[in-house]
Swiss-Prot record:
The gene is rplA. PANTHER family: 54S RIBOSOMAL PROTEIN L1, MITOCHONDRIAL, LARGE RIBOSOMAL SUBUNIT PROTEIN UL1M. Disulfide bonds: none annotated. Binds directly to 23S rRNA. The L1 stalk is quite mobile in the ribosome, and is involved in E site tRNA release. Part of the 50S ribosomal subunit. One of its GO terms (cellular component) is large ribosomal subunit. One of its GO terms (biological process) is translation. It comes from Rickettsia prowazekii (strain Madrid E). This is Large ribosomal subunit protein uL1. It holds the Pfam family Ribosomal_L1. Keywords: Repressor, Ribonucleoprotein, Ribosomal protein, RNA-binding, rRNA-binding, Translation regulation, tRNA-binding.
Length: 238
């Protein structure tokens, strides 16, 4: 390793250490202060994503305690979303005009079977679900299987594409009741990040299973990609 490489490595380590020292691990933050802290502590050269982790007091193994849904983020995600629409030929032009990146039927199914998944969201009309069932085992684990509860199995192709492109985020509680999602880029204004945070947290709170006993919201953590993590003061959540 050259002297230059050593200097760069030392400099990088110093930046990481200094950035992390700005965040106090034993402090609870409200959302506004948390966003400000994460921005000041970010040291990476790329535009990191603001990430949220929510710990819920549920047991997803029970069917009546599944927490899942979608949220339209007011300020978007900052990502370019590729949308595939599986529909009959007579609706393909409508899907293309609405902004779909990939449109078709059996051609898309064949690509999926071949391992070619070049989309982030898959939308389908109800009459195509029997065909899509043949690739459910491929799409399901990737979170790409169209679902009427998430608005991705619909006759309203135009609106579904609009929602997906404008910043619709899916959430689902995994094992131990953990929800994880990216809610925008750290370069967003504080106001836009707070709008996204409030929309997402509000949606998860509204999704509380009926009849659930005990505390539903156990903990919330915010972090940025490769950055420090801060814990949110739950009493500050309205």
């Amino acid at each position: 390793m050259s002297n230059k490489d050593i200097c760069v490595k030392i400099s990088g380590s110093k930046k990481i250490r200094e950035a992390r020292e700005k965040v106090k691990s034993d402090t609870l933050y409200n959302l506004t202060n948390a966003v400000a802290q994460l921005k000041s502590a970010s040291y990476v050269k790329f535009d990191p994503t603001l990430e949220i982790v929510m710990k819920l007091g549920i047991d997803p193994r029970h069917s009546d305690q599944i927490v899942r849904g979608v949220v339209n983020l007011p300020a978007g995600t900052g990502k370019t979303i590729r949308v595939a629409v599986i529909c009959k030929e007579e609706r393909e032009e409508e899907a293309k005009s609405a902004g779909a990146d990939l449109v078709g039927s059996i051609n898309i199914i064949d690509e999926i079977k071949a391992g070619q998944i070049n989309f982030d969201v898959c939308i389908a009309t109800p009459d195509m679900m029997s065909m899509i069932s043949s690739v459910a085992r491929i799409l399901g684990p990737k979170g790409l299987m169209p679902n009427p509860k998430l608005g991705t199995v619909t006759l309203d192709i135009k609106n579904a594409i609009k929602n997906a492109k404008s910043g619709q985020v899916e959430y689902r509680a995994e094992k131990a009741g953990i929800i994880h999602a990216g809610l925008g880029k750290l370069s967003f204004s504080d106001q836009d990040l707070l709008k996204n945070l409030n929309a997402f947290i509000g949606a998860v709170i509204k999704a509380k299973p009926v009849g659930l006993k005990g505390n539903y919201l156990k903990a919330i953590y915010l972090s940025s990609t490769m950055g420090a993590s801060v814990q949110i003061d739950l009493t500050s959540i309205s």
